[in-house]
A protein has these predicted regions:
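Transmembrane-helix signature of 12-pass secondary carriers
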Residues: 1-169
Length: 169
């Protein structure tokens, strides 16, 4: 989401008539939510279990992607991005811990490193996705200026639902 939003705001901002302050809040809202999630997710996962919380996190990611894509106002976009921020913050804390707990000592470092690498690859994929949708925007009715930003946000649903499904294995 953090990578996607850079391409989204040039379309969503004008659609919702956002001023600079509102644009700033939409862009930064996941960071605030992530801080809150980071503060509580460790203790919560100690009580409930990391895997259970990570399943909820995956669901929140998927929900946030769809809610962002279908936002009809500044407020709904802001709330949807806050939900995504909660998921992101919890995942940053819990995923490496969970991986370390379930992996054997010979593979632990490699597996946690791969998880961190996947975060960076996700940012790269987001930028490529924005580029792709912007290029489609100029050649396709389906990706017009009015809805291309919705596709940019909605495409996040794909990795989120894969994450959700794989958490059950």
């Amino acid at each position: 989401d953090a990578g996607i939003i850079s391409g989204v705001m040039s379309f969503a901002g004008p659609e919702f008539n956002l001023n600079d302050a509102q644009t700033g809040w939409v862009v930064s809202s996941p960071s605030f939510a992530a801080m809150i999630a980071m503060l509580v997710s460790g203790k919560l996962s100690d009580r409930i279990g990391r895997k259970k919380i990570l399943i909820v996190v995956a669901f929140l990611y998927a929900f946030s992607a769809l809610a962002s894509a279908y936002s009809y106002s500044y407020e709904t976009l802001y709330i949807a991005r806050m939900i995504g921020g909660l998921a992101f913050g919890a995942a940053l804390i819990l995923a490496p811990t969970y991986i370390a707990e379930i992996s054997n000592s010979q593979n632990r470092g490699t597996l946690v490193s791969i998880q961190q690498l996947n975060i960076v690859l996700g940012f790269f994929a987001a930028f490529l996705s924005n580029y792709y949708f912007n290029n489609l925007n100029s050649t396709s009715q389906i990706f017009s200026d009015e809805i291309v930003w919705r596709w940019m946000l909605g495409v996040e649903f794909i990795p989120a639902i894969i994450y959700f499904i794989l958490m059950f294995f």
